[in-house]
Amino acid sequence: MKTKIINWGMIGAGDVTEVKSGPAFQKVEGSRMLAVMRRDEEKVKDYALRHSIPKWFTDAQKLIEDPEINAIYIATPPDTHDIYAIAALAAGKDVYVEKPMVLSVERAQELAAAVHNNKGKLSVAHYRREQPYFKKIKTLLEENTIGKPQMVLLQFANKPLTEMAMRDPKIKWRLDPGQSGGGLFHDLAPHQIDLMYYFFGTIRDVCGISHNQAGLYKADDVVAGQILFQNDLLFNGTWTFNAFEEVDSCQIIGTEGKLSFSVFSGQPIELVNKNGSQSFSFEALKHVQQPMIEAVVAYFKGERSNPCSVEEGLEVMKVLDALTGK
């Protein structure tokens, strides 16, 4: 029996795809990047040449309809995620869509309906849950190394963007709620919120507040919120993008110990309990999405369960909307 090959077509060829994700599609067994689409003809030709991709398109629908392609990777800004995903599903293609999955809960529900009404599969690129670093944290929790988790304290802070940075096309769209959903918070927080859902499961209640403090751009730049999980764990999170120093800190406090780690900076995981202190370090991944892409390819081939479903993406969108008052 011939093994199924996942032939990818990629819609969008921006900065995130250059190293984080794009090359990994060619390195995963049973996977190859067959085509790429970008509206700028010269840029898409250059991208295809540099990454040894045999086909290129300037029209997304033509890429979707290519009979050789059986899976679509959507790496555009979030305002078009659901548009391309629904079109791909209607064409019978499997879909791997970048985070945030869409712009709102309503659009997430429409995408979920499209998944259920078509044969194609869909996975969301909440890729940190497949990285060894975060799988280790999940294992430590499952092994009850800190007893029953009681509270999560997450703090995230970035320095304000410079005027030059705000004019950079790679950043500018992230600051427009119409394209990104809600600024830098919507760009980064999906990773953090998804990990909490991955670690702790069903969410019972969410409350939050967001505000535009600095007025540097349209989107809010400070967010604070709480999440109550079904297991009675309480999450407290704060995000600011106008700080004098950068902070990337998360603590999970249990009845018998504490786990401390970072979501983005790769600091060693620190475990403190009655047995003393332990530290766990991991090498940085060259292609940060490769473990997730391996899992998605296996799912599309029918070899495992979905590593991150549309329903899980919907739960993250519900939290993002609740924290920002949408």
PLM regions: where:
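N-terminal Rossmann-like dinucleotide-binding module
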Residues: 1-51
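C-terminal helix-rich "cap/oligomerization" subdomain common to oxidoreductases
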Residues: 1-5, 31, 71-73, 109, ...
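Contiguous beta-strand/loop segments that form the cofactor/metal-binding neighborhood of enzyme cores
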Residues: 187, 193-266, 293-304
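Short, conserved SAM-binding/catalytic segment
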Residues: 46-53, 111-115
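C-terminal glycine/acidic-rich active-site capping loop/insertion
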Residues: 127, 249-321
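Beta-strand-loop-alpha-helix segment that lines the small-molecule cofactor/substrate pocket
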Residues: 71-78, 82-129, 144
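Conserved SAM-binding strand-loop segment of SAM-dependent methyltransferases
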Residues: 53-60
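Predominantly a Rossmann-like dinucleotide-binding segment in NAD(P)-dependent oxidoreductases
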Residues: 128-209, 213-215
